[in-house]
């Protein structure tokens, strides 16, 4: 079950109970005790980019977080997808909000299943058009790093660390694939 359980019906406001719905579902769901509405708890999508700089894509733009969790740690520009936007639109929006970067979107690079916390992380490759950045309020600093310069011990999230490792592996062959990773 969700670590933030549903307590009240979104339709009528009455109390819900977790049980198997009458429709044959095999998982306990939040079911309203009055109007019998079934409430489903679904994963959240986190979307972002791997912004690269240079003809060879040897530098990566990272943002130092100015928010919790993991304040002061480095991450790729990313955040929760909003309603009414595609994954690519959300990734682009987050990159502008967090880094103030100008870039060209490229292909989807990683899909990370983080089932333990009910999230799916998607990262797109992006080619920076400028090395001037205007970080937003969620970012202390936006900076370019080569692979050797990346502060690996200061990376905020495992999904970001794994995405960066896969990027640099693919970069060596100049063939960028699409990677699906399950994070335990």
Indicate where each model-derived feature is located.
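Small-residue-enriched segments and motifs
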Residues: 47-49, 58, 103-106
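Unchanged
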Residues: 81-166, 170, 174-176, 183-184
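A generic fold-level signal
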Residues: 4, 44, 55, 69, ...
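Conserved hydrophobic/aromatic beta-strand scaffold that supports enzyme active sites
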Residues: 8-11, 29, 50, 62, ...
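A broadly conserved sequence feature marking short terminus-proximal activation segments
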Residues: 1-7, 49, 168, 179-184
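Conserved Nudix-box catalytic region and its N-terminal flanking loop in Nudix hydrolases
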Residues: 42, 53-97
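Acidic, metal-coordinating catalytic segment for phosphate/diphosphate chemistry
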Residues: 2-49
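Short connector loops at helix/strand junctions that flank enzyme active sites
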Residues: 27, 42-46, 69-71, 76, ...
